[in-house]
């Protein structure tokens, strides 16, 4: 006998409830972890790819990327760079087999202050996806939300029809500049903002709605909706499910497999907290930012300045680790070391 509709409804997981008013995205490079949670989209970053590339399950992809780098030839540096681009695309292509939507693939964080290099690298990634038979409509290119990154996003969207996901976003200034650039999606971070406040203030714990990361994303969401920006707001970097529930109703939320699992086991009732209608009532005023005013406003936010630079360094460090890993596999093995 099937359970009654009332009981079924009561037992609906927080994850299923969340999916009714927010697009759920899986934040992982481990595509075997995606099946269980049935997300719409998925996001990757250099740290996630580095972690996945060290798992036994994914060594075939690593070998394929290495073979590709060798085949293209050139200097050792060129071969490594081509192998890494290919590895990111191979992971993205496998993830796309498991989701109906889009995957985000990140441009090397070491290019975060070079607009033209970011544009070139993004176009290269899209070309590799095309070679794999994947349309650019299923890809979001992730770029750091520096001034240069935001302008690279604007150029990619306007001139090349390449959709961008602006990441490492911590300040209201970054969010406003991204909206004005007309990028497809932003990833304002939640947990890393909380981390900063816990480390740098006397307050060590917060209720979800008072969480500084939650408040930051709420303000950005309300601003975008009040002034009818089309850019999607995708909350990212969560430390607990309380933060996620406090942002229910946000356009998209990208969530790690661990927290997706917790939401799946949670049967508490979930209600939307954010809404476009409520955003209209916010007292936010529209602002315009050129480069000078962007840099000033962003610089006024100590947390955002520190977390953006820290985030770039961390992603860059993991890119270097990935390079070393591939160098070891590609060249030291050849030399019998």
Swiss-Prot record:
One of its GO terms (biological process) is fructose 6-phosphate metabolic process. Homodimer. Heterodimer with isoform 2. Interacts with KPNA1 and KPNA4. This is Transaldolase. The first 10 amino acids are essential for nuclear localization. Disulfide bonds: none annotated. It comes from the Eukaryota. The modification N6-acetyllysine is found at residues 115, 219, 269, 286, 321.
């Amino acid at each position: 006998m099937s359970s009654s509709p009332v009981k079924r409804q009561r037992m609906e997981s927080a994850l299923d409830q969340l999916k009714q008013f927010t697009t759920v995205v899986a934040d992982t490079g481990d595509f075997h972890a995606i099946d269980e949670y049935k997300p719409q989209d998925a996001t990757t970053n250099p740290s996630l790819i580095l972690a996945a590339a060290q798992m036994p399950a994914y060594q075939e992809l690593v070998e394929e990327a290495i073979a590709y780098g060798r085949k293209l030839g050139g200097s050792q540096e060129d071969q490594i760079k081509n192998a890494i681009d290919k590895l990111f695309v191979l992971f993205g292509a496998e993830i796309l087999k498991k989701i109906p939507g889009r995957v985000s693939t990140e441009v090397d964080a070491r290019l975060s202050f070079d607009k033209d290099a970011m544009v070139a690298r993004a176009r290269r990634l899209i070309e590799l996806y095309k070679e794999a038979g994947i349309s650019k409509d299923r890809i979001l290119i992730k770029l750091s939300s520096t001034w240069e990154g935001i302008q690279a996003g604007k150029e990619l969207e306007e001139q090349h029809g390449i959709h961008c996901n602006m990441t490492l976003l911590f300040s209201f200034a970054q969010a406003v500049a991204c909206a004005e650039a007309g990028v497809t999606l932003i990833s304002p971070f939640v947990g890393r903002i909380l981390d900063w406040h816990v480390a740098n203030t006397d307050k060590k714990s917060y209720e979800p709605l008072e969480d500084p990361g939650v408040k930051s994303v709420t303000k950005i969401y309300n601003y975008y909706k009040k002034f009818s920006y089309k850019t999607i707001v995708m909350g990212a970097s969560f430390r607990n499910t309380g933060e996620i529930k406090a942002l229910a109703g946000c356009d998209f939320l990208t969530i790690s497999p661990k927290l997706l699992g917790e939401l799946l086991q949670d049967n508490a009732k979930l209600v939307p907290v954010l809404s476009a209608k409520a955003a209209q009532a916010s007292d936010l005023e529209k602002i315009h930012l050129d480069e000078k005013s962007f840099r000033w406003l962003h610089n006024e936010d100590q947390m955002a300045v520190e977390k953006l630079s820290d985030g770039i360094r961390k992603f860059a460090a993991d890119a270097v680790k990935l390079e070393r890993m591939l160098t070891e596999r590609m060249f030291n093995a050849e030399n019998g070391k």
